[in-house]
């Protein structure tokens, strides 16, 4: 036997399998979800925003007049999806058909004051919503979050407004949205929030006591060894059984 060495995972970024139960992942730096740089031009309308999670939800807008636009270099060097504050919104297919727990994170900013409605919705669902920063004033990038242990629906998600109301239109830029089908543990929540804050320039909005206020979190994406119960040589992790 040789010297035992520590294994350090090469990939420490958030991925679709990093935190269990990720059911919707929208990223404005990868609108088509293919993992490569987007070829969209500044100001082009966004008819669909591809879900990067394993669930592969459909998030789109079929009506040309209600589509947000793609904006380059609005979160520093990163692109964003801009909603006009009048009637832009996107709709998702049902993430889950039964009630249960959830955890949602949404990154947004408003560069110009007076755009959209006060109390505008970043995300609207029956029974709950995620609201943009209070009022219609400008605000720097920040991570909005919301969660529940149970009783929440994820069947009729709208991004950017509530279509049943004319006073909830969001005017500003969205960078990233993550929805999990359970309430995350505190450590998980802080890691996801820290990742988003550092990625989108929102660390200034984190409280001073946040564990990732100064340094971005590192995720462990290394392969996990799982014994197969009942399989000869594998029900106990041994040298011969691996």
Regions picked out by a protein language model, each given a short descriptive name:
Residues 136-148:
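Carbohydrate-binding surfaces in secreted/extracellular proteins
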Residues 1-6:
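Extracellular fibronectin type III
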Residues 23-24, 79-81, 119-121, 157, ...:
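Short Gly/Ser/Thr-biased coil->beta-strand turn/linker motifs
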Residues 44-139, 167, 182-191:
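Extracellular glycan-recognition modules
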């Amino acid at each position: 036997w040789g010297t035992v060495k520590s294994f350090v995972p090469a990939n420490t970024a958030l991925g679709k399998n990093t935190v269990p139960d990720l059911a919707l992942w929208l990223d404005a730096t990868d609108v088509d979800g293919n993992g490569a740089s987007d070829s969209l031009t500044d100001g082009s309308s966004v008819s669909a925003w591809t879900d990067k999670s394993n669930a592969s939800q459909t998030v789109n807008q079929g009506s040309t007049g209600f589509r947000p636009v793609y904006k380059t270099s609005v979160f520093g060097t990163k692109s964003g999806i801009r909603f006009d504050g009048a009637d832009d919104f996107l709709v998702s297919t049902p993430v889950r058909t039964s009630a249960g727990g959830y955890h949602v994170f949404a990154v947004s900013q408003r560069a110009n004051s007076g755009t959209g409605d006060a109390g505008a919705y970043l995300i609207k669902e029956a029974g709950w919503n995620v609201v943009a920063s209070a009022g219609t004033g400008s605000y720097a990038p920040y991570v909005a979050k919301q969660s529940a242990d149970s009783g929440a629906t994820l069947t009729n998600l709208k991004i950017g407004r509530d279509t049943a109301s004319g006073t909830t239109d969001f005017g500003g830029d969205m960078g990233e949205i993550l929805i999990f089908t359970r309430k995350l543990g505190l450590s998980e929540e802080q890691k996801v929030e820290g990742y988003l804050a550092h990625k989108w320039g929102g660390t200034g909005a984190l409280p001073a006591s946040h564990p990732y206020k100064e340094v971005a979190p590192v995720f462990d994406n290394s392969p996990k060894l799982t014994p197969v119960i009942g399989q000869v040589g594998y029900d106990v992790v041994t040298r011969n059984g691996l």
